[in-house]
Amino acid sequence: MTASAELRGDELIAKRHLPADPERVWTAFTSPASIAAFWGGSHATVPPESVTVDLRPGGEFALDTRAPDGATRRLRFVYVSITAPHELVFDEPVTGLRTTVTVRPAVDGADLTVHQRRLPPELRIAQAADGLGSILDALATHLQHHEATPEWRTP
């Protein structure tokens, strides 16, 4: 199974079934090492040392993405609300983009929805949908190849 992603005006909605329980999915979205492992999807890499996470409303997380040509881009987000292990909302201050990550228990894992609102015009393109889909597919691969360990547990 692969991710599905759909553009609707200034919104992008991507969905993916994941082979892990909601707590592991949550930790993947909030752990610097896991974020580095999947965030670049098929189109970029994320140097692990570039990822910072301050998991609280008003806290930031940031990371660098490195394209195949070596171009690096710093991404910065601010957490709006945190409801572990089911919902994470964060904004990208530069573009005004708001992302809501929802994790629901499902048979054999969890169902993940990533809903981005207020997409700027330059991101309302098929390439953005494909990119988000590839990130969710990379997350699924990461979860399949990494066993649950104590650090997967939320506090």
Annotate the PLM regions.
Residues G9, G70, V94-G96:
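Glycine-centered tight beta-turn/hairpin loop motif at sheet-sheet or coil-to-beta transitions
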Residues T141-P155:
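Short, highly charged C-terminal tails/helix-capping segments
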Residues I13, R24, E60-A62, E87-V89, ...:
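General beta-strand recognition
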Residues R16, S50-V51, L75-V80, R98-P105:
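Hydrophobic/aromatic beta-strand elements that line small-molecule binding cavities or substrate pockets
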Residues P22-E23, R56, V80-P85, T102-D111:
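A short, structured loop/turn motif at beta-sheet edges
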Residues E87-S134, L139:
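Beta-strand/loop substructures that line and gate deep hydrophobic ligand-binding cavities in soluble
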Residues M1-T45:
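Hydrophobic ligand-binding cavity/cleft-lining segments
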Residues I13-A14, A33-T72, E151-P155:
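Short beta-edge strand/loop motif at the mouth of beta-sheet-based domains
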